[in-house]
Amino acid sequence: MLNSVLKDAIKKRDETLSILKGPKFEQIVKQAKSNWIYFSPTKQDVVVAGIDSSFNSTKFQGAELWAVTAVSVKSDGEILVDLHEHGLDSNPELASLASKMEIDACLESVDKAELVLMDGSLYSQFLTRQKSLANSLVNAITKKNNVVFVSKTSNTKKQFENLGAIAGDIFYYNHATISPGFSKIHEDPKFGNDMIISSVFARLAESLPLIKIELLGSGYDNDDFKLIFNKILKNIISGYPYALKLAHNNCKISNKDLSKLVSIHGLSNEIGSREVLE
């Protein structure tokens, strides 16, 4: 079956790719080029913190053994906040708990760093979280107005909808330029006037991967984003802030970690338990 699919894919490769690009690909890329603002950041020495969370679980006779962590880490490796919880119950809301812990870590970090970087998209926070969590997040962000959301990928299709874009915005910017800089600021009032998201796609040096930068609120100008790029440039690894890489590495709960948790509780010897999949 797989071989047949692969052979068919080879035959239809160009046809499939043409669907992704769509009939107005060149027109959209031209628009993306005109949206691009050339800017080469200058390193600025500031304290930057990165925040990320992780959760994992394994089922056990109708219940789940789970663990959730969230950390805030400075670019030099100093851990500012280390939050963690675990338990054994049924249907735990792990994503919501991880989000709450991220918000708590953010609230503790805004006074300890000049710039606080949150891993992921503000869109996903507002789309998938309870209203109470969204309100808590807004309060954390507006406490010092120094919180920035950074993501390596993006599925948003906002900037080229009127041109019949099929792929996400980031696809067209990737094809438009390899130069350092950023796209024109896009403001999205989808979640209401108190939750407007202002965003740009940015490349901090030539040929580096694009990242998406999101801020809460409206009225930002190009200089506001340039200042952010200057602040995060010093500790960039492959185009991505090192503080966020450290946060990810420090909070990640692997299946191996979960297996240790199972062993500590003696559940691996219980009837009906199953090995954590690697």
Q: Which ranges hold each PLM region?
A:
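Long, contiguous domain-sized segments
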Residues: 1-42, 46, 78, 94-278
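Acidic, metal-ligating active-site segments
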Residues: 53-91
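Short hydrophobic beta-strand that contains or immediately precedes a catalytic carboxylate
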Residues: 48-51
